[in-house]
């Protein structure tokens, strides 16, 4: 038995992605996409001090630290691709469920709710070393301003070649608040 989760602010544009999530979750692997793609531009932020010295800022590091995880774990996940749990698939008896729950309890004990479930899963994969199948970004597309509509195929596609069909369009992130509120979108 498998569980496929799709956030309420996402919709299926191409069934191929659903098939990839189901196939990717075979053998107790987590099937999931990252929040990074060649179309997305910047994936890390840096606070430049002087010359070539900078403080790197990543979503994984920020959430791990604010959720009370150790400096070692926070650094371990800091530069890894951020896994977006807005869409994922997992077998019911996969070990991820218990480890995710353990990590989520730790994250929530800090009092930080926003992002806690996501960093808990990122730590389960990168620090606890659970099996993962990382799918292409078009399986959980969050760059709404990067959507391109292909009139020939009558569907949304990636902006760069090979212009693959977007599988799931996900209005995740604060940058998409206006789109979520737009009833004409």
Please provide the spans of the model-predicted regions.
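Glycosyltransferase catalytic domains, chiefly GT-A lineage
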Residues: 1-185
């Amino acid at each position: 038995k498998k569980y496929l989760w799709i956030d309420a602010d996402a919709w299926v544009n191409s069934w191929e992605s659903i098939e990839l999530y189901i196939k990717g979750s075979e053998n107790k692997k987590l099937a999931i996409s990252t929040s990074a793609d060649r179309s997305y531009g910047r994936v890390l932020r840096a606070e430049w001090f002087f010359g070539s010295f900078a403080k790197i800022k990543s979503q994984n590091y920020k959430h791990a630290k604010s959720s009370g995880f150790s400096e070692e774990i926070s650094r371990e996940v800091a530069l890894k691709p951020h896994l977006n749990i807005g869409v994922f698939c997992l077998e019911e008896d996969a070990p991820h469920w218990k480890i995710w729950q353990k990590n989520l309890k730790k994250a929530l004990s800090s009092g930080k709710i926003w992002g806690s479930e996501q960093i808990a899963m990122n730590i389960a994969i990168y620090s606890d070393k659970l099996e993962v199948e990382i799918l292409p970004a078009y399986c959980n597309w969050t760059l709404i301003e990067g959507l391109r509509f292909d009139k020939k195929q009558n569907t949304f596609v990636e902006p760069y070649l090979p212009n693959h069909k977007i599988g799931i369009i996900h209005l995740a992130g604060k940058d998409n608040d206006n789109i979520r509120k737009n009833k004409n979108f």
